[in-house]
Amino acid sequence: MRLDRRSILKALGGAALTLPFAGLFAKTAEAGPTPATAKRFIVFYFPDGVPAPAGQASRFHASGGETSFTLPENLAALAPHKASCAFFRGLTMGGTDAGSHPGGAKKLLTGVDGGGGESLDRYLARSALGAAPFRHLYLGAMATQNNASGDKFISYPSAGTTAAPEDDPMTAFGRLFGAGGGAPSGGTTTKTVDPVEASIIDAALGDMNDIRARLGDVEKAKLDLHLEALRDVERRVKGLASGAIPACNQSLGSVGNIDTTRLYDPSQFPEILRAQIDLTVQAMACGLTKVGVVQASQHTSELIMSRFPATPIYKPNFDMRSHQASHYGVMADPKFEEYSKQRTWFVEQFAYLLAQLAARPEGSGTMLDNSIVLLCSEISDGNTHSHDDMPFILGGGAGGALRTGRLFDTAGRRHSDLLGTIAHAMGDTSISTYGQGGQGLLPGLLA
């Protein structure tokens, strides 16, 4: 007896899991040729710029020719992904508000001075990429700390209006995979999921073993991959609630009982950021969303990165904040080395995101092959707060739409042209620049 998709979806049950698997078992033969476009867009933001002092070699920007170039120490973690990345020199965000963290954050994804436009992530979520159960996913790690003002955020649903990211991975998990749903880009939910006492997967897939036994090898492998990846995320989130983070209440009975002040303990920041990355990747693997923003902290960050345990920047009884380190003054100042190590750590988290996408098969390649992942910060050199030679890197093959493994010298082009080229690679060929001050598509970046 042939097992059709209707039978599988009926057996799956649970709206939050039915939607992700709706396209899982589509036969490869049914998929015809498609244009070279990306399937998803992810932004990974880190605060306070990079070590690129004027007149000195940048520790962040690649150097060399288009196809023969070297990665500096801050980018060492990207060596395994070099062929899947596009690097840039010379991109500028323009002179307006130059020297300003808030001014940079406002222009970063909107391409418009003062944040006077919809950000690219929001535009793509409602246009080029089509419908998804969750149109847009905006997750943060200590991004809303200290009642952050709107100019601390980088995602603009409309001109002059930002939205706050969700800093709690357990809340995000419940909204994405739990009953009742909810808006993943902020707001409140009416129903939460207990990540400690219940397995959402097992509850929704009671008779999955029977279904699995009737699948072919290819479909069975796809199902196992998605289920195991989802369980891995669930285990991580359960760990956050049940004791992997030592100060959390081990007898926690529901998400609503979490001491949310623990979300802003810097010693927990690395685990929380990893959880948000995992949630973003898994949501996309399940087809829940096609656009995501992961915001690591906020500009002018008070994040004490010297409290990150088991990292090269860990220094007990020594406080070194991200923003504090960025004002290194001169390279001989010890803050400069601390600042450089902090930037290396952020790039390592970006590399982790790329690795998670690369580890998941999709079609004839991987999720990374079909994605565009933008690494960005709101300023260039942290000491001068420059908006020139911005630290932008693209990861992923965009479904064949981008030429990667290259270093592009953009000779002072406005970053609006990069945003427009990204939109083009996502399938929106109606625009060539996004925002203001642009000239058009960046030469050579599109395949």
What does each of the following model-derived ranges do?
Residues M1-A447:
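Ligand-binding pockets and gating/stacking loops
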